[in-house]
Amino acid sequence: MVETMLNCDIKDIALAEQGKNNIEWALRDMPVLRSIQERFIKEQPFKGLRLSACVHVTKDTAALCTVMKAGGADAVLVASNPLSTQDDVAAGLVKYWGIPVYGYAGESVETYREHVRVALEHNPNIIIDDGCDIMATIYEEKPELAEHIIGSTEETTTGIIRLKALEEQGKLKAPAVGVNESLTKHLYDNRYGTGQSLFDGIFRAANILIAGKTVVISGYGWCGKGCALRAKGLGANVIVCEVDPLKALEAVMEGYRVMPIADAAKEGDIFIAVTGDKHVVDVEHLLNMKDGSFVGNCGHFDHEINVKGLREHAVEIKQIRPNLEEYKLDNGKSIYVIAEGRLVNLVAAEGHPASVMDMSFANQALGIEYLVKNQGKLPNKLLTLPEEVDIMIAKIKLDSM
């Protein structure tokens, strides 16, 4: 492996050796992605193409980027969250794989946005998005770049919502594959990955007992289902807040209590927002919570919990532990906010295990290949990968277990 130094904006290149070890450790547990990499090395499907990826900079996403580069892509990676970057991984990608990385843990929101603009300066043909940041920024700030784009893939429910809005407004100028719609993504990553990594983050941040607590889950999509399942397994009393009657009925059938967040606010001990929407846990809910309640977010953006509004009612904000703040409120209560209201599992922990991300990122890699192979033949709409791709990924995964 050749050591390389590139233009980048990372915390410390001296962390590269540990990052290399972590990336290789992740790849060890990603047999589907490894099999795709072997084929990409031979076929070079992305030779001559520029790739901009805006994803969480973790050992698992790094593995995906190395696979894309192995397939010939001229890749640039920027962080999709100001707090979730694993700095050793960023350094490892720069030094040992020659992939420029722009992102470091604790960067300001302004720096994060500038890094997204770096992805645009790469003038990409293909895009891997996590939250639709690159695509949305292109259409808002540099729509002329759209004519060079073959297509994009989107990892998250939140990003899918934004892409659907762009499509409805007639602004989507290139096909986009909604990876989140693939069965081998949302049935496993969203459910089993989110459920496990959420509580990994809570344990690291607060080290609290879950058994006997009342855990309130706002949102009962696949991520919410996974969070509720793991909370129940840990001995919690689970309340689900869900506006979709079909999903709410499913939650009831699973044995959970279902009620509006306004009612649940008075009963819960731990509150998790996992909807993809804004201010689902709003100021009035936060003020009505019991003294000593914990709140955390497992949706992509940090606006699901109205932390800004909560801050206006705080007489004191105290850092208790890394990734845990106590908000002493003007009503005499204290509320504990995990990871500043950003993604608990990626800020306070390391995200999902590599094994489950293996399938998600296989969909990303094959989604980009699908767009390239069908260039000029696909409508400028939000698309889903063909069923045979799901089946192939599932078969490879099963054979490895």
Describe the function of each predicted region.
Residues V2-F46, L77-K213:
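Glycine/serine-rich phosphate-binding loop and adjoining beta1-alpha1 elements at the start
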Residues E3-L6, A14-P31, F46-R50, T58, ...:
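Adenosine-phosphate binding glycine-rich loop
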Residues S35-E38, K69, E121, M135-A136, ...:
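Rossmann-fold NAD(P) dinucleotide-binding segment
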Residues R50, C65-S84:
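Active-site cofactor/substrate anionic-group-binding motifs, chiefly glycine-
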Residues V55-A73, K185, D189, G193-H279:
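Glycine-rich phosphate/diphosphate-binding loop of Rossmann-like nucleotide-binding domains
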Residues L64, D88-A90, E114-H115, A136-P143, ...:
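Short acidic, glycine/serine/threonine-rich loops at helix termini
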Residues A79, I126-G131, P143-T158, D277, ...:
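ADP-ribose/adenylate-binding Rossmann-like module
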